[in-house]
Amino acid sequence: YQTLRDNKGIKKEVLTDDSGNDRDNAGIAQALDLVGILPNEVINSSDPIVNHNLEGWFAPDTYYYGEGSTDKQVLTDLYKRQQQVLTEAWENRAPNLPYKTPYEALVMASIIEKETSVAEERPLVSAVFRNRLDKGMRMQTDPTIIYGMGSRYEGNIRRKDIDEKTSYNTYQIDGLPPTPIALPSAASIEATLHPADSDALYFVATGNGGHKFTNSLAAHNQAVKEYLGVMREKKSQTPPQ
């Protein structure tokens, strides 16, 4: 998070997502004395990737604090807020979802958070991933490649990145990645647990800010061609530097 001050000296803590490339979670948890705050499934996990992992547990929003506020106080409040949002959404979730625990829903919500910033698309993205999981299909979502690459990501995904088997690359692993890959908003958590009524299995960017959702690989491939055409057209209209 970032700490800002207004002209009255009031601190404003702004929590932002930096893609989670700093993985010294245990050290951070110890330094900020967060061990007693985090849930047992994280602290006591036998999976070294999950153990002490802080990703996803803090609700992204703007919070206001006065002088003397500590990092631990701020993060405790953010954690409690995320727990409240997740618990309420989980208790009111739609039936027959493929998620066994609230933590799995948090993981999915973080992926939706990274896939689209268009509010009305979140339930559709959620439906695509639910449908793929229900059918035993791999999720094949690019943000998981990027997260698994960490600091090696330089702005482009290459074929070798798609083919690399990391713990997060959902082109190479079945099901969900082991932890969240971002800080999911309440809207993404809600979309995860209330997906749209859709049979879509694929989506691709349109080149104009949104995505096109399709039910078959043939239709998806056509949508990809259309996207590439839009991008070529935009590139041709860009004046030389």
Region annotations inferred by a language model:
Residues 3-16, 20, 25-241:
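Bacterial extracytoplasmic/cell-wall-associated proteins, especially those involved in peptidoglycan
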